[in-house]
């Protein structure tokens, strides 16, 4: 496919404007054998033949790659002809397949059948092609791609258009391309196939990955993990807009395909970026410099202009990158090289750079606390030559650095070319430098994580029982996993509820009363949760309200049942869930409890199974992690306890019957005494559940819908909310609610 001896274009044309003509022009510089086929208008005298067999007979060398520039209806026959003539790979450019309805699906099926029968590998359909500048091969209907410089960065993109756009952007940033592939519909060759190919490709130093759909999540993750062990991968995932899709629980609503794909790629070791500009900056750096694995690399900054240096320092600090103060010995050495009024602790402000600039760079880079150096300087007249200074300082692979050069375009381009030739990444602004620094540090941190293969599920873990569980049953199951829950009593009658109240409401302790029914998923939305019950009269009023609920489809054999439960202490509420993702398999999600989690999108996701140690790091990814570390005198999360609970939940899902789609604890409250599960939901596919007033019965597991990005679960009606209670001044329960117990009412999280 990517290193053919010869290429044949089927559907070639001499008419300008035709796809086949553009492809023929793109291949003009290919050094191997070339042949053109046009069954309708053959011109043997002009080198255009009626069939691949005829073309092969008149061509020196083997034709390995067939490029199909024919309509969808003719692709299967053309592919079969190419395979019969000895071609081993094919590029199908046409659209009009699966995306075009039933007729297009038939064309796609016909292509698959030919590929399966003959063994020919197929890239596409619906792609603008690929290019391999190192081999002089441009199999693209964008002839300008033939002018891309050869280099060591590979691009693997879902879209042929994005493949070209990224390659041109990378070239504009002073980079060269080893391979650029647009996957298109991915009927046969997928991104995972290309990534596996690149593992052993000596001409590729780093890989840029763009994803829209993932046909096989576990295979993609395995390919990225293997590739990252050899060379860095920078990934951009499309599909942020699907975060608003509804699902049956917070876990489903939060573990969207976009979030899950990004989390899976991070867990595999890729550096995940937010946009194409950041991708270009990241890969520009990582293709030249890769820090040793390090849990927390230190950044040193040397700037010849204070303002831009401060921009870089400010952004790096916001990214959580450590900027250590330089040692006393380093500062003493800098003091002998710089004017007395300059700042010399880190960042180092040199003032207008002079003849000592190279020595300043070398001294700062040699500081034992500095693992990476970032440099900023303008190309001022009669000032320092930045590229020469960087090389004189020994910056490069042995002394990792990124250099930002500002100034007129021509001057910057000249400096950048020299720096890149020396193996030093050159950027053109503080933001680009910060992107590069973050990528280098992220890559080092991820490789420093304990290299544990995906752990096996604990064989001793008990799975969820086959039948649907109500809240009491779900909490009892959590108890078998060692997860603490409030003291409670399940009651079949009002009399039992009163006896439970007398037992639990000791010393003025208030209780919660809830409807108990496995068919009701979101109890508060139908008035099925009553909090802060302190007297028998209040209990009767609560029971009356629950008895008045209509249309809930109660599954209780004797009618309405109740759960009477002790109120929990105040604390900070989390959501923790394990679910089956349709693309990546089992995943675990953690975030703030309640609707705030969905609104803020502040979640951490991991593929499961996972070790308690890996799960323990999840809360540290949350933007609101300060709430878990004793905010204003509040409770402190024991990471080890959290890791044990999360890993246990993942193991429980794996040990459960296939129809158990999800296990969720929301809220999982952090209190002074540790974690306690205040509510639990176990979702079975095909089980009937109630979703709020007037919602009727909705069936879970109704199917999978495509959001235009990674596949995501079909949306249910609503997701459970939940108040977040925290220490005074942080997150508080809504007015009129009893602090310290779950509620599905929306909470104001402005102070959080």
Positions of predicted regions on the chain:
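Catalytic-core regions of core metabolic enzymes
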Residues: 1-692, 748-752
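Long, intrinsically disordered low-complexity tandem-repeat segments
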Residues: 693-735, 739
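Short, cationic low-complexity segments
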Residues: 737-738, 742-752
